[in-house]
Amino acid sequence: MAKHPLWKDEYWLLLLQLYQKKPMGVKPLYSKGMVDLSLELHIAPEYLHEQMFKLRLVTPRIKRLWEHYGDNPKKLARQIHLLKDMEGYGNATAFYQGVEIKESFEHDWEPLEAEPSLTPVKLIIILDLYFQLTPITMVPETPEIIDLAKLIKTTPDTIVEAMNVYQICDPYLNRNDVVISKLIDACSKIWQRYGNGNPDKLYKLANDLKEYFK
């Protein structure tokens, strides 16, 4: 993977600190710590995840990093505090200047204006559950819907509303009735991205994304 234009060598400190959090080691791709750091730095989790794996390599740079901070978390925390106080830390303004759209991964984690309890990421997870249920079971009382609502911190009714929109998007159902919902735009975009793709890939992605909410 080519070097990200926003990556700085100082960010190794941030990855090392995250790596050392219990349980020590490479964190899941969409763990909360990994995603929050990616949003802070405006660098996709996939890139940071790959960089974190390099902390296990024996290279001169990584060796020095471990020698200086591996057994001294307080020293590491001080250096990170200084890093975050530096001008330009986490500032992507220069990189995004003249660019109207941020990287899609950032938008995927932002609350929907139409329904702040949802994000595109949550809609991806809901879409995966949609494919595991039948229309008659897409009701607030269904245990799987109740469990998912608790996990992603929304309501069963909101999940059912999203599933109703997905039913309209689903060509196999041939629904001709009109659904009035504030989620139509957001759900339609998620369906366009994943609704006609490989369900196994969607299932894996949804399971990976759930890691953030655990």
Question: What is each residue range found by the language model?
Answer:
Residues 1-214:
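Intrinsically disordered, charged low-complexity linkers and terminal tails
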